[in-house]
């Protein structure tokens, strides 16, 4: 079973180009929405990094094993954490344009979202969809994807983003989240958009070297390389899964 985990501020729409190229049937994969991202946020759900990890582990346990998991952005971070906790459920894993790295201090927007009051002010600006759409495209989100994602960035998602980033102190990871990576299964893969303005390629290279994980760099692609270069990503995944 293929399991695709999106990031922030995305929804499962992220995976549509890739799933189309892979020609997967509905019985071949799952691409759930993170709670609060284009869907309701369950009562009592705290939207912290630990809460989302528990949610993802639950998704994996529901499948039961033999999982080929793929994660992007926060979905990549949650994938790494969940897989390190339950490697027994995973056949292969692949993450794109985000990794758990103790030296990475977070991009500018992550630090703003993590800051009380400032984060709320940023989110007020994100309510203006006419301005947000071109801003997302300028940040590297493919236009066709942005037209689907931006309308779904509602109050629930905005609050979930704030809660998530604050639980991670922006994007600063340490202790078990880092040390647990030693438990990752061997069949891992990195797929990276070369020009990502949020997470520099050097972060991917450092992770690749430290944990001995193959790194594919997609020249000229940005943070959403998994959608922008869906054909190339599909080719890599098919080889990775073989």
Name every feature range the model reports, one short phrase each.
Residues 5-7, 72, 192:
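The conserved beta1-alpha1 loop
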Residues 104, 126-183:
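Conserved alpha/beta-hydrolase catalytic His-Asp/Glu region
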Residues 159-208, 217:
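Conserved serine/cysteine hydrolase catalytic core
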Residues 84, 92-122:
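Flexible "cap/lid" loop of the alpha/beta hydrolase fold
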Residues 1-41:
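Conserved HGGG/HGGXW glycine-rich cap/lid loop of the alpha/beta-hydrolase fold
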Residues 71, 75, 79:
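Gly/Ala-rich beta-loop-alpha elbow adjacent to hydrolase catalytic centers
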Residues 221-234:
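Catalytic histidine-centered segment of alpha/beta-hydrolase-like enzymes
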Residues 30-70, 235:
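Active-site loop/oxyanion-hole signature of alpha/beta-hydrolase fold enzymes
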